[in-house]
Amino acid sequence: GEMAFKDCTGLTEIFIPNKVKTISEEAFSGCTSLQNAYIGSSVSVIKKYIFSGCTALKNIVFGGDYYNFTDLSSTAVTGTYTYYPSKYADGWSHYDVVNMKSYSAPTSVAISGTTEAAPGAKVTLKVTATPAGGEFNNVYVLKSSNPNVASISDDGTIIARATGITTITAYTVSGASASVTFSVTPDKPQNLT
């Protein structure tokens, strides 16, 4: 909602997921430690002054082709760069934004690694976005559909918590996503006679 994170000085990075449609007025204003903002492709409306007073803001990375805003002048912090996917260059040509650059947006993402573990175990999944060499291929969010079964951190580390199945999904700022099923099963008994 409006002013949702206003003056949150501990916030250094945000990733607006691909289900959010609107960023309300002054949502992040006054977040003086905010350095990077990644705005998913589903966002279609951005209200005024969302980054007003964000004096540490370095990068605003958009994942889509159209955002309903007239300008980002209230984010004109010296040295802030605004990135948009190069495949949408025509749609971005009418925006008047200082330090605007295109980037090669991920078109697909894959998850690899062990997809089964015993309760209490830690394993790491690897996320790979393509095409290779994209500036923001390493920017994604990982989610577990059932964190009571297994939780996942931003670096891909899964902690198996309880017997069951969960879906692990990786989302990129450009809207690409991939999922794998992760199973937590008890260790098999050994040395049974």
Regions found by a protein language model. Name each.
Residues 1-12, 86-87, 103-105, 192-193:
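Short intrinsically disordered, low-complexity coil segments enriched in acidic
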Residues 74-104:
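Extracellular/surface-exposed low-complexity segments
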Residues 14-16, 20-23, 37-39, 43-46, ...:
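Hydrophobic aliphatic residue packing
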Residues 7-10, 16, 30, 39, ...:
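Repetitive beta-strand solenoid architecture
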